[in-house]
Design a protein with these regions (language model features):
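A generic local secondary-structure boundary/capping motif
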Residues: 1, 70-72, 105-108, 132-141, ...
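Residue-level recognition of short, solvent-exposed, well-ordered loop/turn junctions
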Residues: 75, 82, 127, 142, ...
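Hydrophobic alpha-helical segments and helix pairs
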Residues: 96-146
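Flexible glycine-rich active-site/ligand-binding loops centered on an Asp-His dyad
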Residues: 101-104, 109-113, 117-120, 162-191, ...
Length: 289
């Protein structure tokens, strides 16, 4: 199943080049009162609601996917977790570019274990149609193409062997960053600097996430191209490690690291990202208001 949010927070299932409006499923979500529970209620209830969503999609008129504005498929993540320098060639390029690297001495980029995971503010999350807004045009804003995974149920201290059982699905992720000397989370949490989309492919449909080709172009120029098999720390280990530091909640997002080829974007650019077995999304770059 391919779950999306589109236009004015409508919910859809994507089938081929069309989507089917299943927004009525919101009536089946549990009623909540203040204080609102953390996490995304639709993602938490997805397995229970899935049969009815499929039935609603069967009855809905198809809408061309190209005609809608895609939001992030996850509306309410409690947190976005990032994995740094998770491709060896990206670490090598960071060693050569002081604006990318966070050094620990001897002029080398620190390893994942040395740096630890990092947190992006959930308020930075947008969908591809909303685009990226460059807030500091005098500084370098870089693209980082990544596989994003969405947690489907509460997870704490899970083993690597069981980790994938906690994944609701996968999406294309874009981890934007302003280069500089400030803390990484500070520079990666700017409004619109976390893009997720164009939809979430459920874990059962995508299958094994450890061998997916992906790429990113800017204005048609190839910038990044790699495969998830080249991750330094694989996905089960990332989930397990994160769950030993934080309780993972339904809707939480892990951006699993980027490959080599990161580079600057400017207002007016168009980024296009493709992931095997997920799809393609275009993300415009604009100047911030």
């Amino acid at each position: 199943m391919r779950l999306c949010r589109f236009n004015d927070n409508r919910i859809g299932l994507v089938r081929g080049t069309n989507l089917h409006d299943v927004t009525a499923i919101r009536d089946d979500l549990p009623a909540v009162r203040y204080p609102l529970p953390a996490g995304d209620p639709l993602i938490e209830q997805l397995q229970r609601l899935r049969p009815k969503m499929e039935k609603l999609a069967d009855q809905a008129k198809p809408i061309p996917a190209a005609s809608v504005n895609f939001l992030s498929p996850v509306a309410n993540p409690s947190k976005i977790i990032g994995t740094p320098v998770n491709y060896q060639k990206h670490r090598e390029e960071a060693d050569k570019d002081a604006q990318i690297a966070v050094y620990s001495g001897a002029n080398r980029a620190r390893t994942i274990e040395e740096q630890g995971l990092f947190i992006k503010a959930s308020s930075c999350l947008v969908g591809p149609s909303q685009g990226v807004s460059v807030h500091f045009p005098d500084r370098r804003t870089d693209h980082e193409a990544e596989l994003g995974l969405v947690i489907g149920k509460r997870a704490r201290n899970v083993s690597e062997a069981a980790a994938l059982q906690y994944v609701a699905g996968y999406a294309i992720a874009l981890d934007m960053v302003v280069r500089g000397t400030e803390d990484r989370s500070f520079r990666k949490s700017i409004d619109s600097y976390g893009v997720l989309g164009p939809w979430m492919v459920t874990a059962d449909e995508l299958g094994d996430p450890s061998n997916l080709d992906f790429s990113l172009t800017v204005n048609g120029e190839l910038r990044q191209a790699s495969n998830t098999r080249l991750m330094v720390m694989n996905i089960p280990k990332q989930i397990s490690w994160a769950s030993h530091w934080y309780e993972l909640l339904p809707g939480d997002i892990i951006m699993t690291g980027t490959c080599e080829g990161v580079g600057r974007v400017m207002p007016g650019d168009i980024m296009a990202l493709e992931f095997e077995r997920i799809g393609r999304m275009e993300v415009p770059v604009r100047a911030a208001d």
